[in-house]
A protein has these predicted regions:
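Short amphipathic alpha-helices and their capping/turn segments at secondary-structure boundaries
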Residues: 1-8, 85-100
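C-terminal accessory domains and tails appended to enzymatic cores
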Residues: 4-6, 194, 199-279
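N-terminal glycine-rich anion-binding loops that anchor highly charged ligand groups
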Residues: 9-22, 34, 49-52
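Short beta-strand segments
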Residues: 11-12, 57-58, 100-104, 155-156, ...
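Short catalytic helix/loop segments, enriched in acidic residues and glycine
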Residues: 24-47
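Glycine-rich nucleotide/cofactor/substrate-binding loop typically near the N-terminus or early
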Residues: 42-95
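Active-site glycine-rich loop that binds ribose-phosphate moieties when present
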Residues: 85, 123-148, 156-160
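Active-site rim beta-loop-alpha module in soluble metabolic enzymes
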Residues: 144-206
């Protein structure tokens, strides 16, 4: 590990940011799209990472939310943009990274009073369990980073995702962007306060070493149970290899390799997304 220049992987999402409470706020085609609020928060964090090597992976919706021009202001940032790609939210992670950062993450589906709660697909997935533990996107993706011995070191999101994730990964640095009080409501702190917290957290992260954090992994054999939003979607994904139908809406996969589990989950979301067009 290069102690003088940390290499940081940032997986970017939108729903966990301050200033947004509804789907229109995070939909690029919407007149209510909150790009200004997003960029203020993201730039504050990137400012604190000066001197690091940063890969920023735009992982919300079609992956086209962050303008390429951000790399002019922050020349130490490489931006990954665009839709369907391998490992989607985690594209490009490998053993060379010191830390993973999850920016703008949100609580898992079904979390009480959580702003825009969902897990991978708000329209198709009702719940996900891995080895009996209810999942959110932060935990699912942290385990994928663990395949490459990269720890989740920093989590930026609402209070609910931080509470969920810190129960399992208590050493993770975090910045609470907002207090969620309902599916489409949240309490926002003053912007100046949050921007300062984001920059200071990034500066603190740049002083840390990989050993300060935990590598998250699931013990084998790994079992994922996905509850789909309806029986049609369960019908569709049941055609996938390794998938076992549990009941009307639930399917299950067991495997020793978490990469297989992770890619199967992505395949389910893609199949269900395509089905919205066909049926």
């Amino acid at each position: 590990m290069n102690m003088s220049k940390k290499k940081i992987f940032i997986s970017f999402d939108y729903e966990g940011l301050a200033g947004v409470t509804s789907w229109n706020d995070v939909e690029k085609k919407s007149s209510d799209f909150k790009r200004y609020e997003m960029l203020r928060q993201l730039k504050a964090f990137l400012k604190g990472l000066e001197g690091c090597e940063v890969t920023l992976v735009d992982s919300h919706a079609a992956g086209d939310n962050i303008p390429w021009e951000i790399t002019e202001e922050f020349p130490y940032v490489t931006l990954v943009s665009g839709g369907i790609r391998q490992y989607y939210m985690m594209y490009g992670i490998d053993e060379s990274f010191d830390f993973a950062v999850f920016f703008g993450y949100h609580a898992g589906i079904g979390t009480i009073h959580a702003n825009m709660d969902h897990t991978y697909s708000s329209s198709s997935i009702h719940n996900i369990w891995i080895n009996g533990v209810e999942m959110n996107e932060a935990l699912i993706n942290a385990a994928f980073a663990g395949l490459f011995n990269v720890p989740l070191a920093c989590l930026i999101g609402d209070d609910k995702v931080i509470t969920q994730t810190s129960k399992i990964l208590p050493k993770v640095l975090s910045v609470e962007t907002k207090k969620s009080i309902g599916r489409h409501s949240a309490i926002m702190k003053p912007m100046a306060t949050l921007l300062n917290e984001l920059e200071e957290c990034a500066k603190e992260l740049s002083t840390k070493s990989r050993e300060d954090f935990e590598i998250f992994r699931f013990s084998s054999p790994i079992e994922i149970v996905v509850e789909l939003s309806d029986t049609l979607r369960a019908d569709l994904v049941s055609s996938m290899p390794l998938v076992e139908r549990v009941d009307g809406r639930k399917v299950r996969i067991k495997h020793d390799d978490y990469k297989v589990i992770f890619e199967a989950l992505l395949a389910m979301t893609y199949i269900c997304a395509a089905a919205r067009i066909l049926v």
